[in-house]
């Protein structure tokens, strides 16, 4: 579980953020918790930790397992710094690695400029996967970390958060992301047991 990120989510969204964890809790509990909080939400976003398939035993307890338990589509956030078409091989690997995990699209970050963005969007076209946006490099958006998490002690967080939100609104296809969330998601009463 990550208690620092949930505090940040709560501060930005104005709504409590929770941990979903199949290492410390059963899949059934994760489904119940998600369903309980989803009832009163317009949109539910589940942030993964580490790499998508990184768990305590191969992919057990991973973000991919959470996506499978909850039957959620995955949006990959890919660091595109100093890379272009080679990322196609990596993204294709994520798409094909586990057929039970639906990789619905990609958000690229650390994008260098217009030409770099063009090259990254070509990857999505060639792989027939949605590109939800390309986030540019901005020094103003760099957050200092403290104990592996965001530093809440600095003053002026509100202006940084507003800058982040403006950039995200400009560089992400919010409508396309929201369209994906409108799909009917059937949260199973009892997820399949881990093997």
Where are these regions (language model features)?
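Conserved beta-strand segments of the P-loop GTPase G domain that flank and frequently precede/overlap
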Residues: 76-79, 107-109
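Internal gly/pro-rich beta-alpha loop/helix module
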Residues: 85-194
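ATP-dependent carboxylate-amine ligase catalytic core
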Residues: 1-70, 78-102, 114-118
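Short hydrophobic alpha-helical runs that function as membrane-insertion/retention elements
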Residues: 74-77, 132-134
